[in-house]
Amino acid sequence: MQTAARRSFDYDMPLIQTPTSACQIRQAWAKVADTPDRETADRLKDEIKALLKEKNAVLVAHYYVDPLIQDLALETGGCVGDSLEMARFGAEHEAGTLVVAGVRFMGESAKILCPEKTVLMPDLEAECSLDLGCPEEAFSAFCDQHPDRTVVVYANTSAAVKARADWVVTSSVALEIVSYLKSRGEKLIWGPDRHLGDYICRETGADMLLWQGSCIVHNEFKGQELAALKAEHPEAVVLVHPESPQSVIELGDVVGSTSKLLKAAVSRPEKKFIVATDLGILHEMQKQAPDKQFIAAPTAGNGGSCKSCAFCPWMAMNSLGGIKYALTSGRNEILLDRKLGEAAKLPLQRMLDFAAGLKKKDVFNGMGPA
């Protein structure tokens, strides 16, 4: 770990950066459908399977959505993954229609990368607190105040914010990309997640100014309560997503993206794990490691509000009924202005090219923004 030349919290950030309102969160939870009974779920799955074939469509799902949807995606030749894996899969798959089960920025990313494809979502109102907390006009004005800095934004942002950026990153490749930019002597603006940005700042020593957004799920994990839980289970491996507060990250044995945490849960020899991320990931962890025990990290305790209780309300808005509706009606389609999509594709494609190079262990030269 290195010491950053300029830390995020040394800077007086814009007042526009307010937490996602309790009203928005309540509205999201109010739209979450009841879990269907077994007979109804089986009927819906059969109908969706037929519709996917009929429409030349494929289901692309995030680890945080309903386990019924995750299983259906895999059963039909689709994808279950983190946001990087979803973007890569959608761009490479031959299907003419992508049904993206996740939150809106994921559907937008699919459309940005595949403008010729139809991109549908179970519910277009499935937002993300990070996206909501980073409005394009305010973020762009902040960037304009620091024209000498390279703008790096997390994938959890709107197409308009991506279009303002030089690089888009996911938690899977953020450390590597920021390290690369630091090696080029670049100073950065990072948005919107302050916890992930601060973690990267501390790990790389990069000169970063951070937008002060946060994820309502990961922001609720509590360091003091996690330490107490860890003391109760000293043999457990603590898995932490870096969108969590620093006090939680410091207790992690493994810190990384959902895919990295899943890989650790499956590959490590230990039999007990404490998991500090959205509990939707536990379904795939338990499937791939049925002999292991997974314990949810605490979100309650001192100062706890449990707005999410480790479940994203917008991810929970995805339903089998919503998928069927999108496929039968053709509605809930992601539509983007062509010029906006082209501008947003440049930093997003830059990340995918970088990630592909990492996979091949290539050496990168001259990949900075033009």
Curated annotation (Swiss-Prot):
EC annotation from Swiss-Prot or TrEMBL: 2.5.1.72
GO MF, one annotated term: 4 iron, 4 sulfur cluster binding
Subcellular location per the Swiss-Prot or TrEMBL entry: Cytoplasm
InterPro entries, per database record: NadA, NadA_sf, Quinolinate_synth_A_type1
Pathway entry: Cofactor biosynthesis; NAD(+) biosynthesis; quinolinate from iminoaspartate: step 1/1
Keyword set includes Manganese: no
Binding site residues for iminosuccinate: H62, S83, Y154, A155, N156, S171, H241, P242, E243, T258
A Pfam family hit: NadA
Catalyzed reaction equations: iminosuccinate + dihydroxyacetone phosphate = quinolinate + phosphate + 2 H2O + H(+)
Required cofactor names: [4Fe-4S] cluster
GO biological-process terms attached to the record: 'de novo' NAD biosynthetic process from L-aspartate
UniProt keyword annotations, A-Z: 4Fe-4S, Cytoplasm, Iron, Iron-sulfur, Metal-binding, Pyridine nucleotide biosynthesis, Transferase
Residues engaged in binding [4Fe-4S] cluster: C128, C215, C312
Gene Ontology CC annotations of this record: cytosol
Cofactor annotation remark: Binds 1 [4Fe-4S] cluster per subunit.
UniProt cross-references to PANTHER family, sorted A to Z: QUINOLINATE SYNTHASE, CHLOROPLASTIC (PTHR30573:SF0), QUINOLINATE SYNTHETASE A (PTHR30573)
Function: Catalyzes the condensation of iminoaspartate with dihydroxyacetone phosphate to form quinolinate.
Family: Belongs to the quinolinate synthase family. Type 1 subfamily.
Stored HAMAP family: NadA_type1
NCBIfam families, alphabetized: nadA, PRK09375.1-1, PRK09375.1-2
Name used for this protein in its record: Quinolinate synthase
Organism (species): Neisseria meningitidis serogroup B (strain ATCC BAA-335 / MC58)
